[in-house]
Amino acid sequence: QLAARWLLNIGFITIGGYPDQVPEAYLIPPSAFESDESIPRFDNIAPHLGIDTFDLSGGAIADDFDNDGYLDLVESTWDPNGQMRFFRNNRDGTFTDQTQQAGLEGLLGGLNLVQADYDNDSYVDVLVLRGAWMGEHGQHPNSLLRNNGDGTFSDVTFDVGLGDEHYPTQTASWADYDNDGDLDLYVGNEWTASLQAPSQLFRNNNDGTFTDVAVNAGVTNERFTKAVIWGDYDDDRFPDLFVSNLGQ
């Protein structure tokens, strides 16, 4: 019975109904969750900063997109029909929603966001990843959003060679794996028996376009990829690739 009471209370916590909506006979009082130690609490200040949004959790980036020395915010949602948003830092601790002004209106979904200056123009660009967990229904194009340096972004996905294949993914990582001075991109895709979705290694061609060289590099990783990251673990100045797969 104690386990059932615990789960019932947790259920009400997840839907915001604890403790008021829990039947009195089954209520575990808030005092039971108190600690002997004084633990500081975080207050939700988002409403006061202009960034109070409610949606299915997606990706988030805090970076200086306009090079003014202040961190701006970009957020997305797992909802395929949900609008991603761009919040510009007002330099006073608050933010203004500049989604429409930035040219991002109509860009939907995105379970994850990964930023990088892929074209070496000193402005941070954004990669939007889509389709994860949706299997055959998750073959949505990702979006590479080029920062134009004037407060706007342009979707250049197909122009730069990233839009030829659409696989479900939620993970990618940037690094200059060939040490030629520009960033390359590894995208980890979700391979299943019903949907063959090899991971992709996009080599930067030094002209703002990319070529998928995963087959030649031996990194197609025909598995259900959940996370990828570059790092030079052996200090040879060449980035190495770590891939995490579901159930393997």
Regions found by a protein language model. Give the residues of each.
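Acidic, glycine/proline-rich Ca2+-coordinating loop motifs
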Residues: Q1-Q248
